[in-house]
Amino acid sequence: MIYCSMCGKETEHINILDGKVVCDDCLNKTKHFLCDLCGEYHSTESRVVLDYIVCENCEQTKFVKCSDCGELLRTNIALLYRNDYLCRKCYEKREKYKVKGYHQDPIWVTYGEDKENTYGVELEVDRPRSNGDKNKFSEGVLKILGDGCYTMHDGSLQNGFEIITHPHDKEALLALPWKEAFEYLTEHTFRSDQTSTCGLHMHISRSQFTRESLAKMTYFYDKNYDTIINFARRTPSSAARWARSYYFDKHDNETDSEIIERIATYLDELQLNDRHVDRYHCVNVIKTNTIEIRIMKGTLNYETFLASLDFIMTIAKNAKTVTDLDDNTQWLQGLKPETIEYIKKRHCFTDVFNDEEGGE
C-alpha cells in the first residue's frame, strides 16, 4: 500500500514531489515543475540552465564549467582530463600540446615551399627539479613555436622533454621564433647546454644526398671529429656515448674515390642491418627518409643554436661539390659570418680561420 505524504490517502499513481510521494490531486493543487534531468516534480523555484528546466540539486550536480575556457557543460558530455572537466575544444588543445609518449609521432606535415629538401630539429631540454607539470611548459613553448613542432618524452631526461619539428625547408625552419621559445624555457628554469645528457640533433632529408655525397660528409665528420666535438660543446665521453665516430681513416695510398666507395659500402650495410645500437653515431644513417647529425650538444643560446644549424646545413650542401676530401676550406665555404666568428671563438678549424679569444 502506498499513501500520499500530503493527504494521507492511498494512491495508485506515484508522483515524486520534493523527494516525497504525492497523489495526483495533491500534485495538481501544488505549484510545481518537472525537472528535465531527474524526472521529478519540485515545488521550489525552477532554474533554466542551458535551455533545461532543472531543480536545485541537478543544477549543482549535473553541470560543470570547463576548467580552461569556463564554458558551462552537462557533466555527462564533459571530458575528464586528469582532474579537470573540459569541453571538447579545450580537451583537444591539451592533447595537442601535451608531451607525447616516446615514438608517438604525429602524422608528418611539411612546412615551407621546398618539399624535397627539408630539415628537422630535435632539441632536448631538462629542468633541475620536477616541480610543475611538464605538459604546462610544453603548452607554453608550443604556443610560441606553432603547429610545426611538438614535444616528446625522452628516457635520458629527468624532468624535461624533447622539442621536435615537423619537416621544414631551410627558410621555414630558421623563421620559427626560436629566440622567444628559448627565453620562455630559460625563464622557467629549463636548461640544455648545462646538462650532461641534452643534445641537439638535426635531420636532413635523404633526397639531398647521393650515395657518394653521404660518404663524403661522413668522412668529413670522422676526419675532423675532435675539432667538431669542441665546436659542438661535447666532452669526449659524451660524444662517445651519444654520437660516436666511425673511425674511417685513409689507408696508405688510398685515393679519395676508393675511400668514398669503402665508406659508402659500409653505410649501405649499416642501413640494411637497421640495428638500434648503430643510431648512436655522429652521422646516423639507419633511418629511411633522413640522415641524422647527432654531434651537437643541446643549447638555449640562440646564437649558438643558429651557428650549429648553419654548420650542419653548410657541410651537407658542400658534400655535393667538394673535390678534395681533406681540404677544409672547401668544406666550410659558405658559412655565415656569425658562424665563422663562433668557430673562431671556439678555436676550431684553425687551419682555415684565424682564431681569437672567446668562450662559448
Model-based region annotation:
Residues L17-N28, V48-Q60, L80-E92:
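Cysteine-rich micro-motifs
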Residues G160-E162, D193-F209, T290-R294:
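Histidine-centered divalent-metal-coordination microenvironment in nucleic-acid enzymes
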Residues S67-E71, L79-T189:
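Terminal catalytic/cofactor-binding subdomain
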